[in-house]
Amino acid sequence: MVAFTIEQIRDLMDKVANVRNMSVIAHVDHGKSTLTDSLVQRAGIISAGKAGEARFMDTRKDEQERGITIKSTAISLYASMDDDDVKEIKQKTDGNSFLINLIDSPGHVDFSSEVTAALRVTDGALVVVDTVEGVCVQTETVLRQALGERIKPVLVVNKVDRALLELQVSKEDLYQTFARTVESVNVIISTYVDPALGDAQVYPDKGTVAFGSGLHGWAFTVRQFALRYSKKFGVDRAKMMERLWGDSFFNPKTKKWTNKDKDADGKPLERAFNMFVLDPIFRLFAAIMNFKKDEIPTLLEKLEINLKNEEKELEGKALLKVVMRKFLPAADALLEMIVLHLPSPVTAQAYRAETLYEGPSDDEFCTAIRNCDPKADLMLYVSKMVPTSDKGRFYAFGRVFAGTVKAGQKIRIQGPNYTPGKKEDLFLKSIQRTVLMMGRNTEAIDDCPAGNIVGLVGVDQFLLKSGTITTNEAAHNMKVMKFSVSPVVEVAVEVKNANDLPKLVEGLKRLSKSDPCVKTYMSESGEHIVAGTGELHLEICLSDLQNDHAGIPLRISDPVVAYRETIQAESSMVALSKSPNKHNRIYVKAQPIDEEVSLDIENGIINPRDDFKARARILADKHGWDVAEARKIWCFGPDGNGPNLVVDQTKAVQYLNEIKDSVVAAFQWATKEGPIFGENVRSVRVNILDVTLHADAIHRGGGQIIPTMRRVTYASMLLAEPAIQEPVFLVEIQCPENAIGGIYSVLNKKRGQVVSEEQRPGTPLFTVKAYLPVNESFGFSGDLRQATGGQAFPQLVFDHWAVLSGDVTDPTSKPGIIAKAKRERQGLKPEVPGYEEYYDKL
């Protein structure tokens, strides 16, 4: 039990080589918070009896009630290692005390934006996987996010007690299950890994995989067993480690190692991992769970486990817990992995600097980040806001990448749209206090050097969700985080009592601060809209809004899905519009963009800020565009970065460049609110074929060109088989065989399509993957539990946009009904307009 003081932690912060910033990531319900407990308990914050049940990191009331993690929480732990262990660390260290900043993150798909925020400020990740369920959809999503941020993973195979007690597997089966899990994690890692990370795969024989049970509080790595045996038999530990995993067998008769599973007489040999590692565990389990009172003491003596008198009275699971905790304490295995194999900020920032910093990679700030230099100018990234106990105020939670942050220091707060040399999105303020985040509490500290995680007081009014804090005006921003989910479900909120309106507006501001992925805006009809990533996320946001941020009763509409407008063919004829003064004409045609190009734009592979030559190269090589056309992309829309393009295909038009700005502005407007029902437009390319302009500049100003360009964009889209795209979830359901029928019937009712169904080897569970339209997903998990008697648990994650079949202009078709309902809600004419409304005859 290490009782440590804040001063000790503060001293360790200066030895950056001994700091480890890591987050715990996994699929929902694989036991992240439970595992974190054993680490927190080791640091002496909760009692050993509580560990595994306390879920110390679930700080909110609704987290405790639902038993899920919603927000990521941070805590600092202190660990000291033996000198032998420290020698094995492959990087520079200083002494044998270590400071571990640990962030427990949510596993639920709806909150994966919280995970992104946690990953940005850490360098290593503890990936937790359930032995029985194996690698699931969310494991893959978070691992992909982590590797994209250049974060090094180590693996924990959790819930081993389930395999032993529920499934009663044999030793060889268990080894195969472990091997399969490790292999599937490595497949994901090798698919998404960044070459700068080097080999990021995990290997049990190198000590980067731990096996254990968070609930019972025990875990082990192959390295720990190798240590035991090397002391006992006097063999070299490194050799022993290699032999304890994979195809190596020990022949007790000849005392020789072989890699064949039979000896000379053809008798089967036992795998070394089973014999030396699993056997003692299996024996303990068997003796204790079958109440063999006489065998237990001899076993305990052999394994050098000493029980107190009152502990000897226990039996069954209670005894098992105590014994396993003494035999293989989880904290030892996890701390050893974290300290030995995860990088320190000094190591990590050397290869993460260019992915973190937006400016040139050779300027002084990037160099300071690369060297993790505490004496340079301050560079601090705020990744999220944490609400304080005092209503309406937030701690800014982030990491110092260079320099030192002090209380009272004068700083520049740069929002995500800031560019050096301009004044927008920039505040000059001073920091009131710096604090250390400790799970449910905070501790004040005077300053915090580079490489550490910190909370700041007094900057929350000037940042929306994330941003960069510096002390030098030449510094660029740190890169903005990319979220793997997008807000697709929205509701309108209104107050029950008109006097409360200002409170609602204030509450919405606070809500959008406290959650990295919620979107709040005001629609044209004056409604306040809150958009979230899914049903659960929205539910949590609204309960926060009602109880914390606004603190007033609200009326909440039914959830509505955000659609996109698109086209399915080229315009059937050239669309033409004339300006209000009849002196200018624009001729255009619309054509659909391939889904692959749209995805590349949305994922930032094709970027409006790239050099146009580089962009044309990608479009030509990867997507087969004509190079001349690809170079003439005028703009992306909406918001200057959406998946719609204006391409200039005109020949020798006079004054063309003068109207470019007006055309771009009009296109942003037209794609933000499409012609069908005022939703965002997606995958539309507008080709400008010809423009006739008035010779006199005053007759071709913005007031003439902007409305014309917008009308002609609408006309060209309505001439090109307009359609609606709806968002589609990928659903993954794990269930026993007898529940599959129920799943299919629910999916059929809700327009779902099953993509795959497979059995997990070695378990009775099936995994069903299906596509489910977001529109149909409300109440889906409730219906599913009813149909399967509560045995199926769905995971929904936004996957893609799919075109709704049917004619939009026909008011009886499915898209027609949706368009009509939306238009009525917005107070427009209920019919979708024909192209004649925007098309002008010559």
Swiss-Prot record:
Sequence positions that bind GTP: 26-33, 158-161, 213-215
Reaction it catalyzes: GTP + H2O = GDP + phosphate + H(+)
Pfam families per UniProt: EFG_C (PF00679), EFG_III (PF14492), EFG_IV (PF03764), GTP_EFTU (PF00009), GTP_EFTU_D2 (PF03144)
Classification via SUPFAM superfamilies: EF-G C-terminal domain-like, P-loop containing nucleoside triphosphate hydrolases, Ribosomal protein S5 domain 2-like, Translation proteins
Residues of the tr-type G domain: 17-346
Entry GO MF terms: GTP binding; GTPase activity; ribosome binding; translation elongation factor activity
Annotated GO CC locations: cytosol; ribonucleoprotein complex
CDD domains attached to this UniProt entry: aeEF2_snRNP_like_IV (cd01681), eEF2_snRNP_like_C (cd04096), EF2 (cd01885), EF2_snRNP_III (cd16261), EF2_snRNP_like_II (cd03700)
Diphthamide sites (modified residues): 699
Pathways per UniProt: Protein biosynthesis; polypeptide chain elongation
Subcellular location: Cytoplasm
E.C. numbers: 3.6.5.-
Functional note: Catalyzes the GTP-dependent ribosomal translocation step during translation elongation. During this step, the ribosome changes from the pre-translocational (PRE) to the post-translocational (POST) state as the newly formed A-site-bound peptidyl-tRNA and P-site-bound deacylated tRNA move to the P and E sites, respectively. Catalyzes the coordinated movement of the two tRNA molecules, the mRNA and conformational changes in the ribosome.
Family in the record: Belongs to the TRAFAC class translation factor GTPase superfamily. Classic translation factor GTPase family. EF-G/EF-2 subfamily.
Name assigned to this protein: Elongation factor 2
Encoding gene (name): EFT2
